[in-house]
């Protein structure tokens, strides 16, 4: 007896179906003959890849508003995995950078959604090493049109989502938080399932929230076994001065997690439902979302995590409400003439700078979560991207 799986859209608009035979040995699969051999080669390429997660904190808006917005969005669109052909630059023998890959994906998706800006905002994850693919949120009609675009090998519904009502992603899923935050922090069996994990300080100086969420996901993967489960289990993170995260796992997994290198302690989340978490251990409870931004006075801010499509005009509009601005400067690459993804914002007063630092850190601009920090010196304008230093924890490759 065969169990049918959802159809896959292959480049050119061809729809094929995939089925798994329940009569065969465990793990064996039978694939419809309509699926070409050239498409099967994609599977092996999915093993080693770098990801570009676009992350947003679930605590930045009132839960009721977020839940309503999430429901409305899901009624119009779903998440799709789009596998692309090798970009022209890579085909010529040279490597493809993150910027080039995002441009390639956005240009393709723009043919369906109408503009590159809209396309970039709909892309929620991208891979550009070993395999070229991205995930985007569009409706079914748009997915069919996308499958016909040049360079598109396949468009498939993202089966990592548990259901249409629980659209988990690489972000800290709002739907996940709403579904588990309606009361107790224990299961029906009486056992705790919500844990606060304190972590060691990372070994690099400059760390962004996106990098830390990726790090925490890899740590949790060692216990849960796969990335998707780890992603949707994390519901809170601390990433500036105190490091750690909160996750929804059973007690046995919590005991195993305590033995993972880099983990300082695993204890019940006694303050579930609040952003005030005790990641400092015995040093007191504090809000991790406000870490490093309280009572800091500075005129000059350093902004990272910018979309390549964010203009100085857009950035100025986002920061102007906090006070009079002296300068808004996005750093551009001298060769490509495109944004490097970071900028400097300077105010006339320290009070305005401090207020912007506290309020804007972790906000979303053009679909990307920005990270705001104190600008150390003006010489950082001339750095060649050292502030974007990637944090790559040591973990066993899958």
From Swiss-Prot:
Regions of compositional bias (Low complexity) in chain numbering: 54-70
Record-annotated RRM domain positions: 299-377
Region (Disordered), start-end ranges: 54-79
Superkingdom field: Eukaryota
UniProt-listed Pfam families: MORF_dom, RRM_1
GO biological process, one term: cytidine to uridine editing
Transit peptide feature, positions: 1-88
GO MF: RNA binding
UniProt keyword Transit peptide, yes or no: yes
Subcellular localization: Plastid, Chloroplast
Claim: RNA-binding is one of the keywords in the record: yes
Alphabetical list of SMART domains matching this protein: RRM
Keywords: Chloroplast, mRNA processing, Plastid, RNA-binding, Transit peptide
Main location: plastid
Description of the deletion phenotype: Pale-green leaf phenotype.
Disulfide bonds: none
Family matches, as PANTHER family: MULTIPLE ORGANELLAR RNA EDITING FACTOR 2, CHLOROPLASTIC-RELATED-RELATED
Role, per record: Involved in C-to-U editing of chloroplastic RNA. Functions as major chloroplastic editing factor. Controls a majority of the chloroplastic editing sites.
The protein, known as: Organelle RRM domain-containing protein 1, chloroplastic
Gene name of the encoded protein: ORRM1
